[in-house]
């Protein structure tokens, strides 16, 4: 999940704030997008730097630019790889994060994402991500690793999320035929809850993933 990388250091503007002040916020934080909220801190939309610069009068309030704001955000319990899809699809410098009531809670940026997944120096050919949900007492990494390696896969990195009596294990794998690995794990009664792939044929995550990582590594 993205909860643990949410930043809250940005003073987000409201609709009645003047656009010129938003440019100063962007410069301070080295970003080209800023979330806009209403008086109740409800997320309105994301405004970009170019839209503000192209205003007829940047002294005007942001409310005059409401039609230019993009309704792009993630909820705080979203998976980290949904953030990669969002960043790469919309070429964003930050992603606004909201709660279940659409209240703005913070943002994440590109660097936060890559540091979270710990893949900054990885070869992304044949990279796949699988998420296994299981009870803590059933978690034996050596067995999972054995099943993966027996099917010509390799664990590049992993991280874990613990909720109550369960643990979600996120595995970054190098494998050509990840579907075989998934079927093997399921045959051993492992619950695969999510899958992501750098393969452009995947419906979940395409070659924008590799482009995004390569961009961050330049």
Positions of PLM-derived features:
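Bateman/CBS regulatory modules and CBS-like beta-alpha motifs in cytosolic regions of diverse proteins
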Residues: 1-25, 36-38, 43-44, 48, ...
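Short acidic/polar active-site loop segments enriched in Thr and Asp
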Residues: 32, 93, 154
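N-terminal, positively charged regions that mediate nucleic acid binding
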Residues: 26-30
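A conserved regulatory-domain signal marking ACT and ACT-like small-molecule sensing domains
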Residues: 126-218
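Solvent-exposed alpha-helical segments within well-ordered globular domains of core cellular machineries
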Residues: 3, 7, 24, 85, ...
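A short acidic/small-residue loop/turn micro-motif
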Residues: 51-52, 112-113
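Hydrophobic, helix-rich cores of sensory/ligand-binding and other regulatory modules
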Residues: 107-110
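Short beta-strand/turn micro-motifs at beta-sheet edges
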Residues: 116-121
